[in-house]
Amino acid sequence: MSGRGKQGGKARAKAKTRSSRAGLQFPVGRVHRLLRKGNYSERVGAGAPVYLAAVLEYLTAEILELAGNAARDNKKTRIIPRHLQLAIRNDEELNKLLGRVTIAQGGVLPNIQAVLLPKKTESHHKAK
């Protein structure tokens, strides 16, 4: 008999992370571990960490996109906490979600009450 059956088992396939399977950048395995260790429930389904990682990734991308726009509006190439603050507070839905959140070094939105603004006086100078 020739060497049939002596090739051994199949070569182990290259490991593929659950994040790459789901097409995500956020770590599905780490989210799963944190859900298990966090005493949220006795058991954690396989889809829960994937869904949660996807939601976190989406929210992060949304905030970073708006903060990048705020940085570009201020002619800066680096996002600072001020840009995050401006991005969140100028977006209605993000502001509602993060309404009670304080961003360190974020400052406040520029806002001057209308009553405090100088009155526009209509002075008509009649040339005679």
From Swiss-Prot:
The modification Citrulline is found at residue 4. The modification Symmetric dimethylarginine is found at residue 4. PROSITE patterns: HISTONE_H2A (PS00046). The modification N6-crotonyllysine is found at residues 37, 119-120, 126. The modification N6-lactoyllysine is found at residue 10. Keywords: Acetylation, Chromosome, Citrullination, DNA-binding, Hydroxylation, Isopeptide bond, Methylation, Nucleosome core, Nucleus, Phosphoprotein, Ubl conjugation. GO terms for cellular component: nucleosome; nucleus. The modification Phosphothreonine is found at residue 121. The modification Phosphoserine is found at residue 2. The modification N5-methylglutamine is found at residue 105. There is a cross-link at residues 14, 16, 120 (Glycyl lysine isopeptide (Lys-Gly) (interchain with G-Cter in ubiquitin)). Residues 7-19 have a biased composition (Basic residues). The modification N6-glutaryllysine is found at residues 96, 119-120, 126. The modification N6-succinyllysine is found at residues 10, 96. It is found in: Nucleus; Chromosome. The modification N-acetylserine is found at residue 2. The keyword Acetylation applies. Belongs to the histone H2A family. This is Histone H2A type 1-H. It comes from Mus musculus (Mouse).
